[in-house]
UniProtKB/Swiss-Prot annotation:
Name of this protein: Zinc finger protein 678
GO BP: any one term: regulation of DNA-templated transcription
UniProt keywords, alphabetically: DNA-binding, Metal-binding, Nucleus, Repeat, Transcription, Transcription regulation, Zinc, Zinc-finger
Zinc finger motifs (C2H2-type), residue ranges: 97-119, 125-147, 153-175, 181-203, 209-231, 237-259, 265-287, 293-315, 321-343, 349-371, 377-399, 405-427, 433-455, 461-483, 489-511
Described purpose of this protein according to its UniProt entry: May be involved in transcriptional regulation.
Membrane-spanning residues: none
Compartments in which it is found: Nucleus
Alphabetical list of PROSITE patterns matching this protein: ZINC_FINGER_C2H2_1 (PS00028), ZINC_FINGER_C2H2_2 (PS50157)
GO molecular function: DNA-binding transcription factor activity, RNA polymerase II-specific; RNA polymerase II cis-regulatory region sequence-specific DNA binding; zinc ion binding
Family: Belongs to the krueppel C2H2-type zinc-finger protein family.
Entry GO CC: nucleus
PANTHER family (alphabetical): ZINC FINGER PROTEIN (PTHR24376), ZINC FINGER PROTEIN 721-RELATED (PTHR24376:SF210)
Amino acid sequence: MGTISLCIGVCAFEGANTSTSFYKLVYTAILSYSIQDLLPEQDMKDLCQKVTLTRHRSWGLDNLHLVKDWRTVNEGKGQKEYCNRLTQCSSTKSKIFQCIECGRNFSWRSILTEHKRIHTGEKPYKCEECGKVFNRCSNLTKHKRIHTGEKPYKCDECGKVFNWWSQLTNHKKIHTGEKPYKCDECDKVFNWWSQLTSHKKIHSGEKPYPCEECGKAFTQFSNLTQHKRIHTGEKPYKCKECCKAFNKFSNLTQHKRIHTGEKPYKCEECGNVFNECSHLTRHRRIHTGEKPYKCEECGKAFTQFASLTRHKRIHTGEKPYQCEECGKTFNRCSHLSSHKRIHTGEKPYKCEECGRTFTQFSNLTQHKRIHTGEKPYKCKECGKAFNKFSSLTQHRRIHTGVKPYKCEECGKVFKQCSHLTSHKRIHTGEKPYKCKECGKAFYQSSILSKHKRIHTEEKPYKCEECGKAFNQFSSLTRHKRIHTGEKRYKCKECGKGFYQSSIHSKYKRIYTGEEPDKCKKCGSL
């Protein structure tokens, strides 16, 4: 008879009193097997004394079915014996349908048909809503739920609903803590098989999905799909609230939390909440002290991979972010974004207390501490507190004596980078800070600020003792010594003290015999 798929037509009994379960079992077992595989030749003769071939229409199938007059069945070879044979055969499921293209075997012809579409690229199931095509009907059914918003699968534990059964199954593992998939290489466990598969590629180094545009390779096909959107500029995920679009669905999900204020990720250690899981993961390292990302060049370790990537640019000198306006390059994207505001004049961050605006959010945060008086950065050495971390870093160098910034021109060292930058202008002669009033130029911004007070006659520094005001802070400091009696500048020859360095310098000339400087205009001393 060959391997034609036949089924005993138990639904066409003539007066047979046979259970529904038996008919289901016969249909299930026989559907993918030849009759000879199931029943011995003698049993076939005993069973099929009266047989007719008919097309079975009630199930909507095109298979030919044997219809038996059950009145002739030998009582000694009844349902039980054949049920046992059929159950045994159904459980073994010989894979008799083979793919000619790749040699893979399947138990069902329908599965083979679906499989063949991988090789042919055929996608016969089309979404009427958006035109997207699929190689499986089930995938189209799942896809349609995106348009309808249908989420038929609900979690009994927390009430969360899902489009797909597989999503619910995976979600349940959050509640149970089940991680059934273990890596043989490092014993790490995972909730999902796909996570384990992706993880294994870390050990093998396999990246089977290359980008045809730039050659970059990926461990997962989904990562390649997302990456391609960099080249195409495609942003298929749009926020209904503000219309902002994203190239990743996860980015849209995270963005939505700005509108909802949702922060679903909570730190068990301190109770701090976050709107992204990755932010919680990074935060936890504060408690654990873990720094898993280490620089091979200098050994410095970081809590975040992004921080390591940025740090590496110090060694390589790489500055991949360029300003289109002036051509200046930066090693961080955030630095470029801040820099661009110099050209646009944009200051999007406003202080609600005084109305002052800033180009950077970090500058606003620091500024707010002027109003609150908050000084969160404390020196362990002397207890002095600061409102900026950079100020604490600079202060620490007083105790350590470290001066990490060296001038390549003259070898002079400085505690602060800004001091080195100002110093370099002595060698270059650069004076970038110009007075609009008189045109005089200066190499430091602070010197220009002091100079401007000559024109404005502003004297912002007032003595609390006598009320006298000064245009420079250093002048007020010197003046205060009159009230305190402090004379910090002493003559080494006679021990006489002075409260000003300039007076001390003039006095020293008595012993040195040095002529005092004459005035260039009138010639007087």
